[in-house]
Amino acid sequence: MAPSSPSSARPTRASGRERSAMAEEIHQNQEEEEEVVAASTAKRRRKAASSGKKPKPTPKQAKPAVAGMKKKGETEKTEPVVDDVCAEEPDEEELAMGEEEAEAEEQAMQEVVAAVAAGSPGKKRVGRRSAAASGDHVPEFIGSPVGAAEAHSNWPKRYERSTAANKPEEDDELKARCHYRSAKVDNIVYCLGDDVYVKAGENEADYIGRITEFFEGTDRCHYFTCRWFFRAEDTVINSLVSINVDGHKHDPRRVFLSEEKNDNVLDCIISKVKIVHVDPNMDPKAKAQLIEHCDLYYDMSYSVAYSTFANISSENGQSGSETASGISSDDAGLETSSNMPERTATLLDLYSGCGGMSTGLCLGAALSGLKLETRWAVDLNSFACQSLKYNHPQTEVRNEKADEFLALLKEWAVLCEKYVHQDVDSNLAGSEDQEDADTLDKDEFVVQKLIGIRYDGTGRKKGVYFKVQWEEYGPEEDTWEPIDNLSDCPLKIREFVQEGRKRKILPLPGDVDVICGGPPCQGISGFNRFRNRDEPLKDEKNKQMVTFMDIVAYLKPKYVLMENVVDILKFADGYLGKYALSCLVAMKYQARLGMMVAGCYGLPQFRMRVFLWGALSSMVLPKYPLPTYDVVVRGGAPNAFSQCMVAYDETQRPSLKKALLLGDAFSDLPKVENHQPNDVMEYGGSPKTEFQRYIRLGRKDMLDWSFGEEAGPDEGKLLDHQPLRLNNDDYERVKQIPVKKGANFRDLKGVKVGANNVVEWDPEVERVYLSSGKPLVPDYAMSFIKGKSLKPFGRLWWDQTVPTVVTRAEPHNQVILHPTQARVLTIRENARLQGFPDYYRLFGPIKEKYIQVGNAVAVPVARALGYCLGQAYLGESDGSQPLYQLPASFTSVGRTAVQANAASVGTPAGEVVEQ
């Protein structure tokens, strides 16, 4: 059931009389990051005819193995299968990573305190008195004051009398004696609604604002109020304004209207400025004419909350009012019909892994009435690609680098233009006639058909390669051939391109409705001692962020959803997060950024991640779904982005479900031993909690249409309930860890806890050794985090949660032991902590499966986001408010099926079984 891998390596067969050295050079250049893909570039006696003739291969001979190559008949893979047994001791990197994680946790808690102390990051704009205004011309109001009744009606808070509970020094709103409609500054008359420059602080560019009030304060001073415009560099984008994404740049004349206002004294006004409102969907020519004679223009609004760039809600920038909480809700029922939704949309999943993000998005979109289909997926890990293809058989899964995928898309567009959009029949007729006239030489053979396409950007011969199926040869003899070698086979190329375009094996601009993905940014990893803080994008390990945005710029999807670790907002002053925002805004996308905690959506783990929405100006900008579950708080948001945490306001008292615990997630799973060779087994018991009943549902009950109307394979079976096998020494150690809450290596013989919670050897106990002769308590456990750690060989408990699901299962420096069994958590137990349905099967060695699960986006988070995406796509929500309160029934979708299945279970739905 493995997917067809366009970039899979296969040793080429030497053809004709000699094999070019070119193929060998390709091998040498591809060993570092991916499987070597050899391409036959053999010299030919003569050009092949249009039928695809090629010099016949010489008789197959045994060849020495080339590093990184796959022998014929072997399973295709990007790296060798390793023994699925835990390492005897943690390596230096593993221990260092653990120490980095501990430091990060401590720093995160400090940031929470700092964020609370700092309050809102919004900057109050206080104007400075203009030098010109301090001359002979004293600023003054013009005309009679606005009538008292009108003034009190338009600006009621200005006339509220301060009370003991609302002292003037605590009230940000200046009080007014009267209001005016115009004023004169430096002999220039200004009226309400005028756009002006306002003198800013030292070394700051002058502020830009729209006058909304003129009033005389109770202190007899003359004031004006401005609703501020922001330049791109004034927003959270800040210094990241010089980016260039596929030709898209920030226009220095473009500004963004905000809802922020400040009061300043009248003589801070410098001059008028002509600013026009431009409809973001206006014809480019009409837009050029409109802004030709203005100083500045705006087509979007900006809000510090969720770093939002959005369409102006109504004409001329008169933004519609929002609710006080900035939250919208929909009490309508969800789409729970077993019939597929009528409206469809296409999805491209970049850096897809095993498909957690796209799976969740599709499940959530289906609940809103939108059938979101994952049509394409790209990932470099071949095992993850196998998992995704198995669970989404209709998806075109490509096992290749994202930058080579982008290069292929551009070449594919050229091929489609040549062979699909143009009339090429007349040009190919002569080739077909010539092919009939040619006779087949004894050293030539025929191309039967082309069955795959990829782009090779690493070898000396860069460009498009086709996978060729040779006439009279089996699949094991298929080879990858550069397009130049098939230049005399236009009929075969046309046939492949036309059929491929019909099936949409690759997307063209306009084909993709949604792009999602989490570009890896390993250059900001805490363990990376050589991180480039000044220019993070010059680090090759961060370049995938650029590639992701380049793909967005090329395909121009309606929607973009990027996921990443919170470190992109912390490292180098949030450089990578700001870069991503800057790219979308420069490409004229609406955008907003939020941080979401997985536990808030029904999982027993914390796991905070960043999610960045992008939407074309013609579409509704999606909201963020508010939490539905309580959660144990761990860490916090970076100061500059503290208003991006997706959460209820402190003044609100939402009705949240009780936080889920480990017992809720997997207390129903059968006992397994340290070594479990079977990846398919029976449950052997009934579910005990609502979560367990839900996670066991079949595809149709979850509205997963990956197999169409079919049920899909393996449903009803327990999959991947296998732990990483502990080595003999660790297994002996784990068997001696007590079965109790909080147990760890400190409970082993010979360990004593001294001052400051630091472990030390108990001088009264002789050191205990294992049957292998190694110590029961390893030295690394005693010295980890300077002897203060509780993590080595730590046992989880039923009433706890985990900080995050990790990609490795070694117990040396993390708490990952099962509550009551002598083993680490299984792949399925980890998958449940990530919200993967039980029917979701994984492929590859056991360690690879842990990696796939740990790297995935938590499915319930993606599901909630998918629902908001569907609401926006279908036009059933507006983009003015950043947050959305999910319907009360959202967390119990599938309840009909759940309750039906629960009929034979003693525990009522929603009741958690105590362990």
Swiss-Prot record:
Positions of the BAH domain: 188-313
Chain spans, region Disordered: 1-171, 315-338
One Gene Ontology term from the biological process aspect of the record: negative regulation of gene expression via chromosomal CpG island methylation
Domain SAM-dependent MTase C5-type: 345-876
Gene Ontology molecular function, alphabetical: chromatin binding; DNA (cytosine-5-)-methyltransferase activity; DNA binding
Catalysis performed (reactions): a 2'-deoxycytidine in DNA + S-adenosyl-L-methionine = a 5-methyl-2'-deoxycytidine in DNA + S-adenosyl-L-homocysteine + H(+)
SMART domains reported for this sequence: BAH, CHROMO
Gene3D superfamilies associated with the record: 2.30.30.490, DNA Methylase, subunit A, domain 2 (3.90.120.10), Vaccinia Virus protein VP39 (3.40.50.150)
Superkingdom, taxonomy of origin: Eukaryota
PROSITE patterns associated with the record: BAH (PS51038), C5_MTASE_1 (PS00094), CHROMO_2 (PS50013), SAM_MT_C5 (PS51679)
UniProt biased composition (Basic and acidic residues): 15-30, 71-80
Acidic residues bias locations: 81-108
Extent of Low complexity compositional bias: 1-14, 109-119
Bias (Polar residues) ranges: 315-328
Enzyme class: transferase
UniProtKB keywords: Chromatin regulator, DNA-binding, Methyltransferase, Nucleus, S-adenosyl-L-methionine, Transcription, Transcription regulation, Transferase
SUPFAM superfamilies associated with the record: Chromo domain-like, S-adenosyl-L-methionine-dependent methyltransferases
Listed Basic residues bias regions: 42-57
Family designation: Belongs to the class I-like SAM-binding methyltransferase superfamily. C5-methyltransferase family.
Protein name: DNA (cytosine-5)-methyltransferase 2
Organism (species): Zea mays (Maize)
